[in-house]
Each structure stands twice: as structure tokens, then as C-alpha cells.
Amino acid sequence: MNKTKLRAIQNRQYNAEREAMDTWAKRDLNIEKLTEQVYQSSMQHITDEVDAFYLRYANRNGVSIKEARKRADTMDVTDYFQKAYEAVRDKDFSDEAEEWLRVYNLKMSTSRLELEKAKINLELLKMYSEIENITNEQLEQARLAEIARQTDLIKEYEEQSGILANSVGNPTDRLKGVVNADFYGANFSERIWSRNGHYASLRKELFKSLNNLSVDMMGYRRERNRLMKIFNTSKYESMRLIRTEHQRVNMQVQHEMAVANDFTHYTYVAESGACSICKALAGKTFKIEDYEMGVSAPLMHPACVCSVYHHIEMTYDNGKKTTDDMDIASKDDYI
């Protein structure tokens, strides 16, 4: 291989990664649309519950929530239950009976704060379960697609470089675990369901709004607006996590297959509009043993869609190596 041929191969590799970035961006838009639909549906159900909670507390009795709760709490519960039962049985819907029923319902409402929380909790569980299922399906599709893409790229590289190989190495067992692999100490499922995960964080904020409403109905509009902001923030964070997981899968597949096929180096390819961190790495070539996500390889930050292409170091007839003219860097330079 001569320098001209090597440069042509590298140009094709670079262009292949930039084309892949466009494909990944379209894929991320599709998953974001699905996630948006799930969030919008759940947000509608939950805000409906909050609205109903407010109406049950405030509107039915025409009194302040403090006074309404006081009425319920000072009534003899046993005696009241009997009166309420008799009113329903006898259809005695006088103003007085209706007031009894309203206060009875209010008593159930004050004790139903936990029931409202349970309803919202169930909706959150359904929402995040659906997001997890959709994401895992998309990640598995991304894994298989990247395996196929890398297989084709490796074959092309070997043919163009004159490397004789019977087949492309495929570390099947290692690639199977890519989707559920840890990334900075946690996998996707743990980032959703752990004690400090997305589900627990959003649930905590929603319950806080319910608690606030139960003691201060005058703040209903404020709490409802706060609720909408919380949901939108949570949606953004979930989408960012999904984009990050997608690219993590791509990068891990690339690296595992590069190692299995004896590649010695890789070159960093920054996305268009890359941040200053990624721009500083663009075009840098590292030894394969220096590969470390977040230090010398993508992902350098959440939702990073930069990539790499790989190279096998060879020796020219004149004794020089194919890596001699590359911008070689060390992981230690970026720690």
C-alpha cells in the first residue's frame, strides 16, 4: 500500500462515518417522536387527575380547603357514615342531606390523597415501562444494524488494503451484552428505575405538587404550570438519555469488532457542529488500547454522536509505517 491509496481509504472511511451520523440523526428523530407520544398521553392523564383532584377539593363545597378539611376532621366518623348511608338509602336529597354527602365525599377525598398518588404512580409506571420497552427494541435494532455496517466496512477495508482474511471476526458473546451494558456505572434500565432514576425523580415532584394542592388550593394554577414544566424537563432528559444510549451501543459494537479483527488504531470523527471538546479530538489517531469512552473516544458527553474509524498499522516497503503521517495522540494527553 502507498500513501495515496492509504489517504483514499481514509477519506472513504471518514465519509462513511459522516453518512452514518446522518442515519443516526434520523433514527433519533423517530425514537423521539415515539417518546413524545408516550409522554403526551401520560401527561394528559396525570394533569386530568390533578384537575379532578382540585375540583373535588375546592369547587364542590364552596369553602376554603382549610375550612373544608376542618369540617371533615371534626365530624364523628361513625355517626357520619351512618347518616350518609341512610341518606343514600332513603334518597333523602334535601339540602342538608346533600351537604352531608358532600362532606362525606370530601372526607373520602382528604383520605384519598394517597389514592391520587397511587393513580399517578400507576400512570408513571406505565409510561416509563413503555419508554423502556420502546428503547430496548430500538437499541437492539441499532446493535444489529451497526454489526452489519461494521462487517461491510471491515470487509471493504481489508480488500482495499490487501489484507487476506477468510471472514470478519464477530465476537458474538460480547456483542450480545452491548444493549444492557453499564455506562458510567449504570445501564439504561437502572437510570430509569433506580432510587435516583428518572421515574423516582418525576414521581417525587408530582407527589410534591399533590401535597401542595392538598393544603393550598389557591396555588392550583401555579402548581399546574410547575407540573407542566417538570414533565417537559423530564421528557427532554429521557430523550437525551435515549440518544446517548443509542450512540453508546454504536460505539461499543465498533470497538468490539475492531479489537476482534486486529485493528491497531482508530481516528476520531467529529460531528458537524461539534462542541469544543470534540473539535479538539477531531482527526486525532489513538492506539486501540488507548480507547476509553469519554476520554479518548466518543461519547465525550451526553447525546454525543461523534464516531471513529479504524486502521491496521502496516509497514511500507521503505520500512516506514502507515501511522507515521497520522496525528497520533495518547489517552494520557486527555485525562
Q: For each predicted feature, which ranges?
A:
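Activation/maturation switch segments at domain boundaries
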Residues: 1-138, 227-231, 236-335
